[in-house]
Amino acid sequence: MKKIIICLWALIVCCWGCEDYLSVKPSNVQAIRTYDEVKALLGGHLRMYAEPDYDKLAGTSIPYIGSDIWTFLHFYGDDIDVDTYVKNRYIFGNIKNLYVESANWKNTTQPGVIWKVYYTNIGFFNTIIDELSRVEASKEQADIVRCEAKVLRAWHLFKLMQYFSPYHLNKYGLPVNLDAQKVAEYDASRKTQEEVYRIIISDLTECVECTTEPRSTYNVFYDKNIIHAILAQVFLYKGDSGAKADDDYENAASHAKSALEALKLQSTEDYEPFP
């Protein structure tokens, strides 16, 4: 009987201890409380672009970041010499097979990788914008962070549209959630192309018209020339899509002109051929 009482007492003590253990507040959760913390959180992401671990694409001066995400996008662009690119040393000689599979739309992993990474990034930008609204900051302080996040979010949405939305079918846009508080509760059905482009163009237009000057020591994509260039691409691509409008090409030309006005073209005297 004495042994039974001892065992019961040990069990009670153990359960009591477990209850206390489970009630301990976690110490590995870092809440965002200040503007500087929000700014630093986005700044960590921007560092990838500002100080990338990159080489240059063979035969070009285009920065190359060693990631399948960027590799896939290069395959569908027109700013590289494909013959030179697929023969260079990246991915230890397997890049030619990767290119052929991607060009023929037979790459089995590519869609999932792009979908996951781009939507994860969009969720991150949503969080930045949401947290920014909860901290104290001046208009200028808020603008440089919010515009940076909105330009990046719009660019990611545009790339997803190019890859996953059937070009001429307006009803097949993308699922879009801009509310960081509704991660599992939002409407995940496809919006129309018109609805998605409206979001993209609205965010980019808001940023290009923002009166707060970008900070050269912080901002990367919140750059009026970059925003004009992205808007030119968006309107040009949209111009023959299921969401096309009569003024798309006119808008594309206008934004392209604005993007080029601040650029100095290379003269023949300064030209250096690629090695």
Regions found by a protein language model. Give the residues of each.
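Bacterial Sec-dependent N-terminal signal peptides
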Residues: 1-26
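Membrane-proximal, proline-rich intrinsically disordered regions
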Residues: 18-74, 256
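Short, surface-exposed recognition loops and adjoining beta-strand edges that mediate ligand/DNA contacts
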Residues: 28-33, 67-70, 213-275
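Conserved, well-structured interaction surfaces
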Residues: 88-164, 191-194, 205-215
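Short coil/linker segments at helix-helix boundaries
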Residues: 163-199, 241-250
